[in-house]
């Protein structure tokens, strides 16, 4: 049956498949828009190095860490990573206020390495050094599915009664062969099970899945399948789409120099991301569709340094297609 409906952008859509956009509006559910609705104003996400490690670095499950990861564990942009946690917080917001002097609400973001890879008393002591500061309205935690025991999730549930809590759960790929190749040292099955436990034990906490486009051996179709599995198998509230940045002093650097890794072109990346956005249900918040890397550490792709050019290229392609997030999304099948 042919049907028309008025979508949330005020556009009449044909069976939900024609996804035209109004000029000047993003074609996806952006994090900035979400936070403005949630908190009523622009809100800073304040990255902090809390001194945790990773289980695939310290020998708990493996050694060496993920092959794409630098020695800072994705915390290369943190202003003062060696300072005490509270001092880091204020140095970060002082730095951000140079560009946005009027922002007064903050989300503490324990970003690099695995920020639940410790005993609960250690986790609690480190978190509490930052989350009680004036203006803090939420907590974002970067972690892995093998580092969330029930007692830690229960603590996050308690925190979610006080503030907005987001568990940023690293996945990177749903393919076991890729996961082994990059030394993730956990399975996709464990990821799905962990998402289910977090949803059950800490229902107010939001879950954001991290995926990387451009991992060794993964094709366009495989990257699309990563997203499809992620959003249909898991009750998640957000997703981060990263471009693989090849960095100096990483194990993946060797793969590249030995010809086992082909970096994506900007055109390939834009095409992949637009295809992915179309199959992500529109209620899922897009926390990232590209990323940042320090120029002095980046081997490639060098085009990724022009972040706004990449963002504009994605938006331009979505507009050319007459498309928007979720226009090709399938029914979700996760178990609540």
Model-found features: residue ranges?
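N-terminal [4Fe-4S]-dependent radical SAM core
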Residues: 22-85, 90-107
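Hydrophobic faces of well-ordered beta-strands that scaffold small-molecule active sites
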Residues: 46-48, 106-108, 139-141, 165-169, ...
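A contiguous, low-structure linker/loop signature
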Residues: 91-133, 138
């Amino acid at each position: 049956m042919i049907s028309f409906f008025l979508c949330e952008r005020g556009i009449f859509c044909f069976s939900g498949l024609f996804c035209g956009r109004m000029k000047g509006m993003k074609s996806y559910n952006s994090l900035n828009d979400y936070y403005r609705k949630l908190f009523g104003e622009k809100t800073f996400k304040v990255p902090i190095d809390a001194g945790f490690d990773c289980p695939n670095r310290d020998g708990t499950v493996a050694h060496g860490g993920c092959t794409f990861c630098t020695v800072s564990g994705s915390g290369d942009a943190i202003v003062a990573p060696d300072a005490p946690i509270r001092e880091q917080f204020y140095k970060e917001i002082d730095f951000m206020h140079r560009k946005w002097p009027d922002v007064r609400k903050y989300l503490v973001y324990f970003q690099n390495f695995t920020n639940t890879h410790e005993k609960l008393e250690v986790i609690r002591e480190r978190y509490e050094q930052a989350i009680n500061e004036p203006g803090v309205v939420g907590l974002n935690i970067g972690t892995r599915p093998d580092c969330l025991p029930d007692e830690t999730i229960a603590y996050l549930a308690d925190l979610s009664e006080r503030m907005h809590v987001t568990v940023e759960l690293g996945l990177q790929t749903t393919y076991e062969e890729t996961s082994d190749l990059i030394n993730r040292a956990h399975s996709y099955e464990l990821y799905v099970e962990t998402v289910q436990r977090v949803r059950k034990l800490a229902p107010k906490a939001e879950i954001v899945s991290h995926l990387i486009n451009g991992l060794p051996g993964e094709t366009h179709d495989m990257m699309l399948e990563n997203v499809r599995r992620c959003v249909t198998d898991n009750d998640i509230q957000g997703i981060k789409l990263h471009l693989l940045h090849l960095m100096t002093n990483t194990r993946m650097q060797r793969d590249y120099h030995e010809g086992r890794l082909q970096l994506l072109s900007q055109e390939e990346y834009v095409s992949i991301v637009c295809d992915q956005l179309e199959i992500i249900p529109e209620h899922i918040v897009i926390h990232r569709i590209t990323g940042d890397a320090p120029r002095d550490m980046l081997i490639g792709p060098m085009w990724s340094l022009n972040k706004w050019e990449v963002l504009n290229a994605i938006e331009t392609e979505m507009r050319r297609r007459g498309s928007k997030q979720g226009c090709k999304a399938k029914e979700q099948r996760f178990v609540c």
